[in-house]
Design a protein with these regions (language model features):
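A glycine/threonine-rich phosphate-anchoring loop and its flanking beta-alpha core
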Residues: 1-41, 127, 138, 142-149
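C-terminal and late-domain segments of enzyme folds
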Residues: 18-81, 85
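Short alpha-helical scaffolding segments that buttress acidic/His motifs in well-ordered protein cores
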Residues: 29-33, 75-83, 97, 117-121, ...
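Flexible, glycine/charged-enriched surface loops at secondary-structure junctions
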Residues: 40-48, 63-74, 89-94, 132, ...
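Glycine-rich phosphate/pyrophosphate-binding beta-alpha loops
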Residues: 80-113, 204-210
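Gly/Pro-rich interdomain helix-loop hinge
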Residues: 107-193
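Short, amphipathic C-terminal "tail helix"
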Residues: 190-231
């Protein structure tokens, strides 16, 4: 369902709990990053993704801590622009897995995405993926270069995928968000008992085909296991 209009009125968030500001912002960042590396990306979506990420990384922390009108307005615009990007290029396996973990353990969607995103970035950044995504708009794997472009654009300390991961983790810490599912207080035994089912369901999620690296179920299981106690 794609909206015809978006009402970007930051006063709607005046009484919003800070945790929702953080979760919504990280979800928007995930939207923009996944849209940028999607197999269906194009010049228009790349432009929107980068502008969204610039606005979000520059303003989300201030929006969370002090809630100024300027920062809230910028985050609203960034989230909307990210929506324009992913509604035209779709998302990837970060959202595929987040849908399963969130619905199984009832933790916020933004937190789930934020925990998974660093693992997905490093998984997708492989220069020799097991298999590329279906019908990509490019000839060779490009995820490493695209994550590096994002890292450089947002001023990460390193212009490579690891630099992007560090930038995301530092923002998550600043927003008092968990960096692993263990930190999100999900019981380990219960979590591990659901890993296989969650991986299988994520494989069939509508977001998976747009991921730049077409996953094996075993690889999705590995990502879920890794994300339990490792940021």
């Amino acid at each position: 369902m794609t909206p015809d209009i978006a009402i970007c009125d930051s006063t709607f968030c005046d009484s919003l709990p800070k945790s929702l500001i953080a979760n919504s912002g990280i979800d928007a960042i995930t939207h923009a990053i996944e849209a940028y590396v999607s197999v269906a990306q194009n010049d228009f979506t790349k432009m929107h993704s980068l502008q969204a990420l610039e606005l979000l990384f520059q303003n989300l922390s201030e929006s969370y801590h002090t809630g100024t009108v300027v920062s809230r307005d910028a985050v609203h615009r960034g989230a909307t622009i990210a929506g324009i990007a992913f509604s035209n290029s779709f998302l990837g396996v970060c959202h595929s897995l987040a849908h399963q973990v969130g619905s199984t353990f009832h933790i916020p969607h933004g937190s789930t995405n934020g925990i998974l995103l660093p693992h997905i970035i490093m998984y997708n950044a492989s220069r020799k993926p097991t298999r590329m995504g279906i019908f990509p708009s490019y000839k060779y794997p490009q995820s490493y270069e695209r994550y590096s472009e994002i890292a450089e654009h947002i001023g990460a300390d390193r212009s490579d995928p690891q630099g992007l991961v560090e930038k995301i983790n530092n923002l998550m810490k600043d927003l008092s968000m968990p960096l692993s599912f263990k930190e999100a207080n999900i019981p380990e035994k219960e979590y591990m008992s659901k890993v296989e089912a969650m991986a299988e369901s994520a494989f069939d999620d509508q977001c998976t085909p747009a991921n730049p690296r077409f996953p094996l179920v075993s690889e999705l299981k590995h990502i879920l296991i890794e994300a339990y106690d490792s940021p």
